[in-house]
Amino acid sequence: MKIGEIVAASVIDGLVAKLQLGNPEELKIAFPVIVEGARYDFYCLVEDVLNEESDIADQLAGSTIADVIVPRPETHEGYGGPIFYSKAKLRMIQLVDRETKKLSEPQTIPPYFSACRHATRDDVERIYEVTDTSATLGTITGVEPFHVQLDMKKLVEKPFAIFGRTGTGKSILNKLVCAGILSKDVGSVLIFDMHGEYGVFSATDKTEGLKYFFPGKVDILSLDPKNKEARPFVLDPREITPEDLIVALQDLTSPMVDTLYEIAKGRAGRDLISTVKDASMEVLGSERTHEMSLQGLKRRIGRLDRLPFLKETKEGKDSFNQILAAIRESKSVVLDFGDFGTDQMVYLFVANILSRRLFDLYTERNEDFPRLVLFLEEAHKFLSPEIAPYAHTFSRLARETRKFNLILALIDQRPSRISDEVRSQLANRLVMSLKEPSDVEAALAGVPDKKMWENIIAKLPLRTVAVIGDAIRIPTVIDVLSYDDLNVREHILGAGIFDEGAVQEIAKHADDVFGRG
């Protein structure tokens, strides 16, 4: 359906269409539209919808005679058309040569009065390519139902991120992404499951987790002793480094950090926590160590005393070895935090230790391990400018990912608190609604047409995501697929993947898996 005609055009600044809609509410930001040029179809996104200032409108507003003398939108006055009309600013995304069907970047403009219409399913099918490793993420905003797909193989080749404020649906989006990765066999995933979202069933909304859909591909370990079905997680304290404690505690002063490193130098094979507790000024004998710093460090280290999973093991073989064995078999791992899910210190502590040990192995013996995507929630806690020097594993992962099969995936609501260096390495960004201008700007740093996308991101509704990067043909606003059993089976798993028998067996023990009865 024709919605208007082009009245201004610029390769740099975009197009302006005079709308012929009776109601401008029919058109919204980020809707895809087609401008029919002489040779090309211009695939565009709506950047803005506006009613320009009008002296006549100013004079008539509030007048008792306005309803009598103002022509309705459908009423034309001679050759000039309606007196009052709306306009739309359009951003050109792709050109489609109508003769050859080839796609190209916008390097020209359509003629004056070129017709503008809503994009149809046929239009978008010409734009998006589907590969053997593509998986559905949702439908395109403003188009009759068309399921748009991401190339999961390309997605997991380089670092990527899911950004969005709290409550926008990041967990649901991430479950769809993980399901896509596993269904296409392009890699395994390691998820630090803080809130019981990814195992068999979600503890919050009871939706299905990864173990439900991929019972033979996913192992679950748990920090919480009440989870009787998952394998217990044990961490040998001898594996702890000063950096692990600095990242976990987050509030060590510079003198405390200096003291910690001094103590670590002389631990002689003992675990660092016990060594700190037993340290004294007499033993240290260092001018750099002060009594107040030592006592403050001991008090903070005492926070770890309540963690039941810190246990020395035979030959130092803790749960990391179980995780490694699963990864070697191309399995994915969900680490359930159970009752520790609300404890930020525990999350930072465990995630940093396991990630560091994985990084060391992958960089030393890269050829031995399959591709693994490491999902990091609350990423800014590890990657802020203040902590990043100590959590150097993640900074190096972002910078040097092409050398290994270990890929960093960030999930965060405050991208502005992630260091510029790390954000600059992201090849794909899945950006949901953000309200803080600094977060919007940070999430889109380095993105073409940044100003347009800033406006779109700030106004995205819930469960909607802007996908920008090389895993999709063009930047796209997507209504995220409703996450349920039927949709995941139909649009992501396909035929022959779902093991009904195994799932039914797992489902019988769902309550025990989470220990929540």
What does each of the following model-derived ranges do?
Residues 1-163, 173-177, 368-370:
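Basic- and hydrophobic-enriched, low-structure N-terminal and domain-boundary segments
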Residues 40, 50-52, 94-97, 195-199, ...:
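Conserved nucleotide-binding/hydrolysis micro-motifs of P-loop NTPases
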Residues 79, 396-481:
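Conserved ATP-driven motor cores of ASCE-family P-loop NTPases powering translocation/secretion/packaging/pilus
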Residues 134-222, 467, 488, 497-499, ...:
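Glycine-rich phosphate-binding loop of nucleotide-binding enzymes
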Residues 154-155, 181-185, 212-213, 325-327, ...:
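Conserved catalytic network of the ASCE P-loop NTPase/AAA+ motor domain
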Residues 192, 376, 411-412:
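Hydrophobic residues in beta-strands of the RecA-like P-loop NTPase core, especially within AAA+ ATPase
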Residues 196-208, 221-398, 403, 465-471:
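P-loop NTPase motor domains
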Residues 461-517:
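Conserved P-loop NTPase motor module
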